[in-house]
Amino acid sequence: MQNEEGKTVDLYVPRKCSATNRIITAKDHASVQINIGHLDANGLYDGHFTTFALSGFVRAQGDADSSLDRLWQKKKAEIKQ
């Protein structure tokens, strides 16, 4: 599909689970997307955030908490926070 400027745009861009890399389908109503804010040295929000998407499968298995912790520890090392 094309917009008014002639650029090709997609109507639907599927998300992928951050923990398992599974595609999150439109019918997965148990999936969540979580934004985690970055803090400066004083503990104040600096306007940046990281987004994680978890599928309903991960949440149903009870692995959401450990997956989110693992993903954040990895990301925190990347951004040196």
Swiss-Prot record:
InterPro entries: Ribosomal_eS21 (IPR001931), Ribosomal_eS21_CS (IPR018279), Ribosomal_eS21_sf (IPR038579). GO terms for cellular component: cytosolic small ribosomal subunit. GO terms for molecular function: structural constituent of ribosome. Pfam families: Ribosomal_S21e (PF01249). Disulfide bonds: none annotated. It comes from the Eukaryota. One of its GO terms (biological process) is endonucleolytic cleavage to generate mature 3'-end of SSU-rRNA from (SSU-rRNA, 5.8S rRNA, LSU-rRNA). Keywords: Ribonucleoprotein, Ribosomal protein. Belongs to the eukaryotic ribosomal protein eS21 family. This is Small ribosomal subunit protein eS21.
